[in-house]
């Protein structure tokens, strides 16, 4: 074949229309697996290469999406980032990672900053945004929020039911006879962030069981890191009476707490139960292994990418959607499994 192969050449080789070849190149899902494979074989056989610059110029798109998360040294976000990148790659997109440190200015930069000019849309896990930040954002840039949402409505959103998840975890502890259950990382006032929602679920479970709520057992932390869990557990061991269970609002806190309890020779689960959130890989390998709430991270990634690409393809389409992802309480050794 003389010259560089074109879409027309690929179509003739595969026995399909040029439109079908274009659909395969753009990873449209309605193409059958058999046809998709035939087109890919033709592309490989002819050495066809997509003219990315030309396609982006025609579409006004970059083929890139941004994932903005608070931290990458927190295992939950690192694992989620890997899943989002894999899902985006499957859909023919490249992911630009943006670490915000949970700082409002950096979260705003993901939506309005220099980098936002080079991305087709943003998946953002916010910690510090104000409701007005979303109300005044550039509507030309599609956005999907993960986890916390500063304001109701107006933006596509993917999350687990944090209230139900914490209620289930607390009910598990109550079923084991625990009554003085401390919430490490909890919060009873302020906006409806993840920590507040999980504390609400904890309180609901106590109420359903007829156990009085004790505000002294809600322990705020500076950060959701291992050391903060260890500090909180150490402080709780010096109270009288001690708690008989810890509901830690992420696995980093729980694993830090386990270390502090081990150093103080407190038997887990003999004297005290520990439950975490997120089901990070380390939770399966701690001693004792950690009972934890496992959000469906694979589904979070799939739904977030799908919602964002739908919004990129049809900005004025469906109204903003809330996608609630399932969760599972994984019972392990830290609560007697």
Question: What residue spans do the PLM features occupy?
Answer:
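Periplasmic-binding protein-like
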Residues: 118-126, 182-185, 219, 240-250, ...
């Amino acid at each position: 074949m003389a010259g560089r192969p074109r879409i027309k050449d690929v179509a003739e080789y595969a026995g399909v229309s040029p439109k079908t070849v274009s659909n395969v190149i753009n990873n449209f899902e309605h193409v059958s697996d058999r046809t998709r494979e035939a087109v890919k074989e033709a592309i490989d056989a002819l050495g066809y290469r997509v003219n990315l610059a030309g396609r982006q110029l025609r579409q006004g798109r970059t083929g890139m999406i941004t994932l903005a998360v608070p931290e990458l040294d927190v295992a939950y976000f690192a694992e989620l980032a890997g899943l989002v990148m894999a899902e985006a790659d499957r859909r023919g997109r490249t992911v630009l990672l943006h670490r915000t440190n949970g700082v409002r200015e950096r979260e705003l930069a993901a939506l309005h900053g220099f980098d936002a000019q080079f991305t087709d849309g943003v998946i953002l896990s916010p910690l510090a945004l104000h409701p007005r930040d979303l109300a005044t954002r550039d509507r030309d840039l599609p956005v999907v929020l993960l986890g916390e949402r500063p304001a109701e409505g107006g933006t596509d959103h993917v999350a687990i039911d944090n209230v139900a998840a914490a209620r289930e975890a607390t009910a598990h502890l109550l079923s084991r006879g625990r009554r003085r259950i401390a919430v490490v990382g909890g919060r009873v006032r302020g906006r409806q962030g993840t920590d507040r929602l999980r504390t609400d679920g904890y309180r609901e479970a106590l109420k359903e069981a007829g156990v009085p709520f004790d505000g002294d057992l809600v322990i705020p932390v500076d950060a959701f890191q291992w050391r903060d869990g260890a500090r909180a557990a150490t402080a709780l061991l010096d109270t009288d009476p001690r708690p008989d269970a810890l509901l830690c609002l992420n696995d980093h806190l729980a694993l830090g707490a386990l270390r502090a309890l081990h150093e103080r020779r407190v038997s887990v689960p003999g004297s005290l139960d520990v439950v975490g959130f997120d089901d990070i890989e380390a939770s399966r390998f701690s001693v004792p292994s950690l009972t934890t709430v496992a959000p469906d991270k694979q589904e979070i990634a799939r739904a977030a990418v799908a919602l964002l690409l739908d919004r990129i393809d049809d900005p004025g389409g469906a109204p903003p959607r809330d996608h609630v992802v399932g969760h599972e309480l994984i019972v392990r050794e830290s609560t007697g499994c």
